[in-house]
Amino acid sequence: MEKDYSEEVKAIIKTYNKENIVFGKDIDLLLKRVEASKEQIEEEIMSCNSLSFVKKQVKDNEIRYALFFIYGKKKGRQYVITFRNRELRIITVFTLGKKTLKKYSKKGLNI
């Protein structure tokens, strides 16, 4: 079973403001993909409500965190973020469906 980095990420996020959030990809593409507004995404990340699991990734000489927000058995969202130059950078956002959530729970993630 993988280690959960939720508490570490929550502590880091508390040091940031909404003004420090930057999107790594085209914001319109990400908003359309998850059918949410920019304010909703910012509020969700800053509050960390529904955050159930955080996975740490080392890629391209930087530390990335995959944040899994679960809203029920059928719905969820995954954010991939990094902290760079006093900015919280949202690299990408995915929606998680029923099959994906079921697959992750079978893998042993406590989602």
Label for each model-derived stretch:
Residues M1-I111:
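Ribonuclease/tRNase effector modules and their secretory precursors
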